[in-house]
């Protein structure tokens, strides 16, 4: 018991031992210093809140365009390629993919300019390609909403113009292909006509040599190239005249090609009739700013001011009570 009592007495007299009650008393005595430090910290925080740039984020959710928005474009593709035209679902997926790529490119441009702007695009639901969430950060709520809507419209118009150019290029190429097809079919039809006339002329020569002027056969449907001269020279001469003035004969494919070519020439697709996205949620008007956070800033100011004030009080008291050890 004696040893424990002495030990306790020794600990109580140790000058290096921290006495919690004494510590609290020191802080209480220096409360004015702490209060002043807290007030200064709050004033600095208020000053920061007044000069700091506010950040407001507007968000929109978009997805692929619906069938009506791509109807003009898909109809044009159907005219161009018929049964080989892409499905409407493929067109919709292509449109939103091009929008996403163009929007990402614009985001990079804005981020790399002298006065950076934060424009983002990402999956709205993780793991799902659609819908997409796009957002823009500005110094005002109205500005964020307005600029986001403007950038979405800007990308939509740019992609629509690109699609219009692509479609016009395809129209030019397909028109050239169809015209070449028509020319080829016309050449073939003319060659067939010339061949027919030569065959009749050859039969006429044989008929003249054989001195056959009148038909020697009754069933003309049985006439072949070898027996055509039996029709007689008079009939063969009439046939040559008829063949020379007879229009070219074409297959149904020729007239279908001409109809397709006419339909293509009548196509009218402009950028303002094409939209490459559809809103699921239009750009929001933010009601809470991202930063600076007033409540958090003031709470941190109070805590920091209190800690600095307490440090000043304790440091000052420690210097006053400091006694250098004797050598």
Swiss-Prot record:
Listed pathway(s): Bacterial outer membrane biogenesis; lipopolysaccharide biosynthesis
Topological domains annotated Periplasmic: 53-294
SUPFAM superfamilies documented for this protein: Bacterial polysaccharide co-polymerase-like
Record organism: Salmonella typhimurium (strain LT2 / SGSC1412 / ATCC 700720)
Subcellular location: Cell inner membrane
Gene Ontology terms, MF aspect: identical protein binding; protein tyrosine kinase activity
Cytoplasmic side: 1-31, 316-327
The protein's name in its UniProt record: Chain length determinant protein
């Amino acid at each position: 018991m004696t040893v424990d009592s002495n030990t306790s007495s020794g600990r109580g007299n140790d000058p290096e031992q921290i006495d919690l009650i004494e510590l609290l008393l020191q802080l209480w005595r220096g409360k004015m210093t702490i209060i002043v430090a807290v007030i200064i910290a709050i004033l600095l925080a208020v000053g920061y809140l007044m000069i700091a740039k506010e950040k407001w984020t507007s968000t929109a959710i978009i997805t692929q365009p619906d069938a009506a928005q791509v109807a003009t474009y898909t109809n044009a593709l159907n005219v161009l390629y018929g049964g080989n035209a892409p499905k409407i679902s493929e067109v919709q997926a292509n449109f939103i993919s091009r929008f996403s790529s163009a929007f990402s490119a614009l985001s990079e441009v804005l981020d790399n300019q002298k006065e950076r702007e934060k424009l983002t695009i990402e999956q709205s639901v993780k793991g799902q390609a659609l819908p997409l969430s796009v957002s823009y950060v500005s110094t005002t709520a109205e500005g964020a909403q307005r600029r986001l809507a403007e950038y979405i419209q800007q990308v939509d118009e740019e992609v629509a113009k690109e699609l219009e150019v692509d479609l016009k290029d395809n129209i030019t190429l397909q028109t050239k292909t169809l015209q070449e097809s028509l020319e080829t079919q016309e050449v073939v039809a003319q060659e067939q006509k010339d061949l027919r006339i030569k065959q009749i002329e050859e039969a006429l020569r044989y008929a003249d040599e054989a001195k056959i002027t009148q038909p020697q056969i009754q069933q003309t449907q049985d006439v072949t190239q070898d027996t055509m001269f039996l029709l007689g020279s008079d009939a063969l001469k009439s046939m040559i005249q008829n063949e020379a003035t007879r229009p070219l004969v074409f297959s149904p494919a020729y007239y279908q090609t001409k109809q397709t070519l006419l339909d293509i020439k009548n196509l009218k697709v402009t950028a303002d009739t094409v939209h490459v996205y559809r809103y699921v949620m239009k750009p929001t008007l933010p009601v809470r700013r991202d930063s600076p956070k007033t409540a958090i800033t003031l709470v941190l100011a109070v805590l920091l001011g209190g800690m600095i004030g307490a440090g000043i009080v304790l440091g000052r008291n420690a210097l006053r009570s400091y006694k250098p050890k004797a050598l």
